[in-house]
Amino acid sequence: VAMMLWRSGPMGDLKLIYTPTAIIIAQVVISFPVVTGLTAAALQALDPRLKLQLYGLGASRLQMIWMLWKEARLPLLAALMAGFGSVISEVGASMMVGGNIRHQTRVLTTAIVLETGKGNFDIAIALGILLLTITFLVNWALTWIQQRGAQR
């Protein structure tokens, strides 16, 4: 991703390197294979008779896609959680394409690395606790949604 966004790279004319947009692009590239693989597995695990049943009931293509996604919602939430986990803990790509520029492209993970390198372990630990808290709350909310959906 970094080589594509560098000034001499194929997307260099867009001047995206060291911007928040570059960080977003890098995070999408990192999480895409995880989310795509788990989503494909979730959809393939559906009972093949469900598609035939929906056809038999006269469902349109859009209605069928909606029902299949709805039926696979719990594994899809697991895919979302896995993608979030890979993105929230990532440091390298954010540092390379974002540059860790104060007030512009510094994110929690790169700030933790910076503060640890400067010897400010108290700040690094506080940022780490904040990152863990955010991660815990997001995963708790998604797990709650999954469990609520499983009861239906």
Residue ranges and their predicted role:
Residues 1-28, 98-101:
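Membrane-interfacial helix termini and adjacent extracytoplasmic/periplasmic loops
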Residues 3, 76-114:
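Non-cytoplasmic
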Residues 5-13, 46-47, 89, 101, ...:
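Membrane-interfacial segments
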Residues 9-16, 68-71, 117:
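Helix-boundary and loop/linker segments of multi-pass membrane transporters
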Residues 11, 96-145:
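Interhelical loop and adjacent transmembrane-helix boundary motif
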Residues 16-40, 70-75, 82-89, 135:
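Faces of alpha-helical transmembrane segments in polytopic inner-membrane proteins
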Residues 17-21, 51, 62, 73, ...:
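Residues that define the loop-to-transmembrane-helix transition and helix capping
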Residues 33, 37-51, 55-58, 62, ...:
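C-terminal transmembrane helix and the adjacent membrane-cytosol boundary/short C-terminal tail
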